[in-house]
């Protein structure tokens, strides 16, 4: 339920060094002169500095550019671009980690750092809402150590729904225990191509397209170890399993996915015939998706 001592030591060496760099770069807490394993950092400052890091992870690239690190440590830090920050629910605790559910109903197994998440949140019976950040670390998922439980009572109906989310994920092998970083890196490059191709649109429109495509690439495809090309064959599953909303919202999702694959065709990542087949599938299935997803 927690990292080995060797891995937890490595995490904190990297994490405190990144906190120290970010604090000095942006002057977030001028009263804190240095942050490392020996000095530590108070929680208030840690939350403020970490918020800055997760708000714009380009600071990780800046840190790596100014510090020579072994390749394996660089890979860990680069993987933190794929942090998942937000409000979650700890549904239960297992021997291998905490069962944590995000706002998109994705179910994760998350390990503690120097102590289990069960011990860290022992004053709060499950299920419990928390605010935090999930991080890839080698072949597991952890947090940045800054978990804030909410003292909110979860009613019986909600408890039953959360239990069913976990049981369904377990039955279908949907539980996420690691993040495929190589695949996420590949998708990150594809997203850069796409963003460049839609740069003539308004900032709000670009943001909306990017959020939808990132959701599709990272939280749907990559979580199943599927590449962008694989997505051409599982659109129906995506809409059946992941999507709910009004017909207008479904139309927006279809538009974003079409634009993305058009960009991929223009960059020769898929064939023109593949793109045309995708457009035909969307046109044929949109009425059904719009009806079935309109919950």
Regions found by a protein language model. Give the residues of each.
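Structural detector for short beta-strands of small beta-barrel domains
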Residues: 78-96
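OB-fold (S1/OB) nucleic-acid-binding surfaces
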Residues: 91-114
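Short nucleic-acid-contacting surface segments enriched for D/E, G, S/T with interspersed K/R
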Residues: 114-133
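Mixed-charge (acidic/basic) macromolecular-recognition segments
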Residues: 128-131, 135-211
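Non-catalytic DNA-binding core/recognition domains of DNA-processing enzymes
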Residues: 201-266
């Amino acid at each position: 339920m927690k990292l080995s001592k060797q891995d937890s030591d490595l995490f904190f060496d990297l994490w405190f060094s990144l906190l120290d760099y970010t604090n000095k770069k942006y002057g977030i807490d001028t009263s804190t002169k240095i942050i490392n394993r020996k000095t530590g950092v108070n929680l208030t400052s840690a939350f403020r500095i970490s918020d800055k890091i997760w708000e714009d992870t380009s600071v990780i690239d800046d840190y790596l550019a100014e510090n020579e690190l072994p390749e394996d440590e660089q890979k860990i830090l680069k993987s933190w671009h794929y942090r998942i920050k937000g409000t979650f629910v700890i549904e239960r605790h297992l021997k291998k980690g905490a069962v944590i559910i995000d706002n998109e109903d994705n179910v994760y197994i998350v390990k503690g750092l120097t102590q289990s998440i069960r011990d860290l949140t022992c004053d709060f019976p499950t299920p419990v809402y928390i605010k935090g950040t999930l991080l890839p670390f080698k072949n597991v998922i952890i947090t940045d150590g800054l978990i804030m439980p909410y003292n909110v009572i979860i009613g019986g109906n909600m408890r039953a729904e959360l239990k069913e989310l976990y049981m369904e994920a377990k039955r279908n092998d949907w539980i996420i225990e690691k993040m495929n970083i190589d695949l996420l890196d590949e998708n990150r490059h594809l997203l850069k191509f796409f963003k460049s191709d839609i740069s003539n649109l308004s900032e709000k429109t670009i943001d909306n397209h990017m959020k939808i495509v990132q959701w599709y690439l990272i939280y749907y495809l990559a979580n199943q170890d599927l590449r962008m090309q694989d997505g051409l064959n599982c659109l129906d599953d995506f809409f059946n399993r992941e999507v709910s909303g009004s017909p207008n919202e479904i139309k927006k999702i279809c538009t974003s996915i079409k634009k993305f694959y058009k960009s991929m065709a223009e960059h020769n990542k898929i064939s023109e015939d593949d793109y045309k087949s995708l457009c035909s599938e969307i046109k044929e299935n949109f009425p059904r998706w719009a009806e079935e997803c309109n919950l």
